[in-house]
């Protein structure tokens, strides 16, 4: 309810918003509260709607900002570390070396394919790999594929490394829901345009329909794209930037260590970030330190004893751990940063989101599918072309 009301207020104020909903229910209530004059600003992204899939390409970058290539490679590797970190022995230094060089080889020449599908192809298809090498202008990457990968034997041989990398891509590429989304050459919406022009991006990542790992991958990609778009705003004077508000529920599942960059850097580019989660043990130590070391405003509803003890220093001396453990339903404690100055903590009552106009929700979804989606048969045909010899 709290997040919903904040998002609805931003939308009603005419601001740009992105919301990642891991449940799929909150976005329905938000859609019902879109003002009439903002209906055309809405982009509703539901990857489980397969008739007209929308593209989301992590490897896509703006050629006017060549530094984005390095960001894409680093962020993609961080994403796969996040997804497969439970099995660290499969992602050692050799895996990283091949992974980074395969990704760099692909993005050096977008014209010959620039998706996650093509990273997998460049590992398995020698003809395609040779084409990429011929067109690659990065001498370090070319040297790796010719002098190191091409001559390595034993455990370091290309044939031995390939399954370790492609198996991690194939989980998504073989999935009938995911493939038409992540294998499109161009994302269906431009994140910089969304931020600059006050668009409303509502992302439905319902795990029940997508599965955990698929939902997490898409969420991680969107967070990376938002960060990349925010950092590219360095070319615009601050007084000309429109503020943009980014909301993430269950953020621990869709953030890498780059969240520290969002918290410390992106505020310069008028990106406001609001993150919600259920308990602190969900968060990796590195991300936890980045979050609590950078956030300006903290709000807590009733929580358990361990989390209450952890947060007590944030709310003392006004509230104790015992107070935090006994907050009434629909109430919270809040500590804000106002004009760079911390306020004293205070308690606050929250209210349900307004009912809005539920009758407009399905029409708004269909509008997004028509404007931003592509016919599935067309998408699958374009993908199939890449496998024709």
Name each model feature, range by range.
Residues 207, 252, 279-281, 305:
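Active-site-proximal loop/turn and secondary-structure-junction residues that shape catalytic pockets
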Residues 1-271, 287, 324-328, 332-342, ...:
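P-loop NTPase motor domains
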Residues 78, 90-94, 261-264, 281-389:
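P-loop NTPase motor core of the ASCE superfamily
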Residues 22, 276-282:
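Conserved H-loop
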């Amino acid at each position: 309810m709290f997040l919903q009301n904040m998002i609805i207020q931003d939308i009603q104020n005419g601001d740009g918003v992105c919301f990642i909903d891991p449940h799929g229910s909150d976005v329905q209530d938000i859609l019902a509260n879109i003002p009439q004059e903002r209906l055309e600003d809405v982009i509703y992204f539901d990857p489980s709607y397969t008739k007209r899939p929308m593209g989301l390409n992590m490897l896509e970058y703006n050629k006017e900002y060549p530094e984005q290539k390095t960001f894409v490679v680093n962020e993609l590797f961080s994403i796969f570390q996040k997804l497969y970190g439970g099995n660290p022995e499969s992602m050692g230094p050799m895996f990283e070396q091949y992974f980074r060089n395969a990704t760099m080889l692909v993005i050096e020449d977008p014209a010959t394919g620039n998706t996650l599908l093509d990273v997998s192809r460049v590992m398995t298809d020698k003809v395609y790999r040779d084409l990429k090498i011929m067109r690659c202008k990065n001498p370090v990457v070319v040297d790796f594929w010719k002098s190191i990968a091409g001559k390595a034997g034993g455990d370091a041989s290309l044939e031995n490394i390939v399954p370790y990398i492609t198996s991690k891509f194939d989980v998504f590429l073989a999935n009938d829901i995911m493939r038409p989304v992540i294998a499109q050459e161009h994302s269906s919406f431009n994140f910089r345009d969304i931020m600059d022009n006050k668009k409303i991006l509502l992302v439905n990542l319902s795990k029940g329909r997508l599965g955990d790992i698929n939902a997490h991958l898409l969420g991680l990609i969107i967070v990376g794209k938002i960060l990349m778009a925010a950092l590219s705003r360095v070319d615009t004077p601050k007084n000309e930037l429109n503020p943009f508000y980014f909301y993430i529920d269950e953020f621990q599942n869709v953030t890498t260590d780059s969240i520290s960059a969002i918290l410390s850097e992106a505020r310069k580019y008028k990106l406001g970030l609001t993150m919600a989660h259920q308990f602190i043990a969900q968060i990796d130590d590195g991300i936890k330190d980045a979050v609590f070391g950078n956030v300006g405003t903290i709000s807590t509803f009733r929580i358990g004893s361990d989390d209450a003890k952890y947060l007590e220093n944030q709310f003392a001396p006004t509230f104790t751990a015992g107070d935090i453990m006994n907050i009434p339903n629909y109430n919270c404690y809040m500590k804000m940063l106002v004009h760079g100055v911390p306020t004293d903590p205070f308690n606050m009552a929250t209210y349900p989101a307004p009912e809005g106009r539920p009758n407009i929700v399905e029409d708004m979804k269909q509008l997004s599918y028509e404007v931003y989606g592509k016919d599935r048969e067309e998408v699958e045909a374009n993908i199939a072309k890449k496998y024709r010899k």
